[in-house]
Amino acid sequence: MKIFQKLLVPVALLACGVAYAQFPSVLKLVKSVVIPDSNIVFSVSNKAPKTDAEWAAVLKSAEKLVAGAQQLMPMGPDTGREPWVQFTQSLGASARKAAAAAKARNADAVVAAGDEMFEVCEGCHRM
């Protein structure tokens, strides 16, 4: 299931190509930050970090996702903004949980935050 998540996010993005084509900066941010950094958070479910460097990488990715969620918020559609704003806020909240868990070196909490993040991403792509 967890490996499936790594593959599903990019596939879901491709399925939303029409919506993202309207917002090229959204697509750029998703491809450059959201996908690679969420994959690092998701990877903890397959292999928990052990070294300082591995934990630092998870923390850095979670922090980049927090910033990315803040950058995404104003980029959404002009109409029907409420769901967009809710999803970007939820993405930021789950990324903050992942960052806190990485700081505490709590792999189970990182996985839980990653699962929450995955659900947020899925919900947004169903919009």
Show the residue positions of the predicted features:
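Sec/Tat signal peptide C-region and signal peptidase I cleavage site
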Residues: 16-21
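Sequence context surrounding c-type heme c attachment/ligation sites in exported
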Residues: 23-127
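A generic structural signal for short, solvent-exposed coil/turn residues
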Residues: 13-15, 33
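Bacterial N-terminal signal peptides that target proteins for export
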Residues: 1-11
